[in-house]
Amino acid sequence: MKLRKLSALLLTLCCAVMLGSCKVTETATTTTSIPGKNTIQPAVLTQEESDLLELLDVQQPMLFDFSVEGASGYRVEIFTLQDGAWQPSGGSTSPIDEPDLRGRIALTFGEDGRFAGIAFQAGDGVSRISQDPETSAFVSHASTSAADPIEIVLDEPIALWAYYGEQEAAASTTAYFPDHALQNPQEIQSDFAQLITITFAAAG
């Protein structure tokens, strides 16, 4: 319960407070994290945002900024691998009322690296999903995430993050990148695997 409350607080701060204009200014250099049209990409934090996370003394969330045109809604889905196929295990769907929308997605994780919560900030609202920690523990684990800008194609899922857990210390882990894991679940040999995707829906 403590982790769940902390995750909810962190998600609210990350998305409601930190989105701002999405323009980034760093020491000695000036860059922008504003994504291009119909693009989702890893966010770059301002110094103020980084200082806020340090003040909270929590693990830094994984952040993505996006810009999308012509979408009627979005769907965030959490999948768990079962018998070589991805099975839905949670998610959230919301409408989009703006023809040209910019926003930010924040993912938080537990001490063992597993998914703990997600927040979606766009316009004036923030939606959140929190997940209680799994009771089973893994001896080793690995995770991967989307590292480069990705073109948003309406009605096609975009894999943002993948997690792999092993129950035996001697087991080797092949940590596929999220896009490969989404398309090739039958190749995953880990004892446990989880995947998060986002899909922007076309109008009509």
Q: For each of these PLM feature ranges, what is it?
A:
Residues 1-10:
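Bacterial N-terminal signal peptides that target proteins for export
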